[in-house]
């Protein structure tokens, strides 16, 4: 009887241990699933297709549109906004507790696309007029087609261009108003473009050269006059003065 009770207790203990292990595995799988499908950042991939997809931005708590290249993506990649919200709408940054470390490790192992550099991605950057307003418009190597605006420092106005979706620069704005607000009259004397700088430097060099040549000519003329005066004084000696005085006496 005692052996039977002991056997039952052992079975109950093993069943409890098994259920705990199973629940732990399921919880780990769920956390891993949440991480892979909702917490990682979007990945455009190395291919150059142009597929509209949705990804869950856990910081904003919303699903956002992006352009997928067609390969080397991750699980945070949905065909529709509804599918994205269904999977991740209730997920927050603190949903998985201490998964921040594992999330960073996973992000580093996923091949990521070149970081999009445009005017919307400068939350921690200091404003630099040359970087945000004088740089040329850059379409980039990707093949998406985003209408953007850039500031033309020579015309002091914002013009539209097509942004490919990757490897742009900071002089890229989603609206003309944002472009003008960022760059128009931000600097009373904005730095000149490289071509204008070369022209200005060349003009200054020519002016300095002309002034130097003019000063040299004036100096040489003065030296020549002084030498001529000294030569005349040497020829007209005191003996010549006496001879001239005697001639004048005889004439009188």
Curated annotation (Swiss-Prot):
Domain BPTI/Kunitz inhibitor: where?
A: 38-88, 133-183
Q: What broad class describes the main subcellular location of this protein?
A: membrane
Q: What is the effect of changing residue 148 to H?
A: In DIAR3; likely pathogenic; results in decreased inhibition of prostasin due to abnormal SPINT2 glycosylation
> Which top-level group of life is the source organism from?
Eukaryota
Where does the signal sequence lie?
1-27
Give a brief account of the tissues where this protein occurs. Expressed in placenta, kidney, pancreas, prostate, testis, thymus, and trachea.
What terms describe the molecular function in GO for this protein?
endopeptidase inhibitor activity; serine-type endopeptidase inhibitor activity
**Keyword Disulfide bond on entry:** yes
Q: Which CDD domains match?
A: Kunitz_HAI2_1-like, Kunitz_HAI2_2-like
Q: Provide the membrane-side ranges marked Cytoplasmic in the record.
A: 219-252
Its transmembrane ranges are 198-218
Report the InterPro entries cross-referenced here.
Kunitz_BPTI (IPR002223), Kunitz_BPTI_sf (IPR036880), Prtase_inh_Kunz-CS (IPR020901)
Q: Where is this site: Reactive bond?
A: 48-49, 143-144
Alphabetized, the UniProt keywords read: Cell membrane, Cytoplasm, Disease variant, Disulfide bond, Glycoprotein, Membrane, Protease inhibitor, Repeat, Serine protease inhibitor, Signal, Transmembrane, Transmembrane helix
Q: Where is the composition biased (Polar residues)?
A: 100-111
Which locations, inside or outside the cell, does it occupy? Cell membrane; Cytoplasm
Q: Which residues are glycosylated?
A: 57, 94
What's its job?
Inhibitor of HGFAC. Also inhibits plasmin, and plasma and tissue kallikrein. Inhibits serine protease activity of TMPRSS13. Inhibits serine protease activity of ST14/matriptase and PRSS8/prostasin in vitro.
Kindly identify the disorder that the protein's record connects it with: Diarrhea 3, secretory sodium, congenital, with or without other congenital anomalies: A disease characterized by life-threatening secretory diarrhea, severe metabolic acidosis and hyponatremia. Hyponatremia is secondary to extraordinarily high fecal sodium loss, with low or normal excretion of urinary sodium, in the absence of infectious, autoimmune and endocrine causes.
Q: What is this protein called?
A: Kunitz-type protease inhibitor 2
* UniProt organism field: Homo sapiens (Human)
Q: Tell me the lineage of the source organism.
A: Eukaryota, Metazoa, Chordata, Craniata, Vertebrata
Gene name per UniProt:
SPINT2
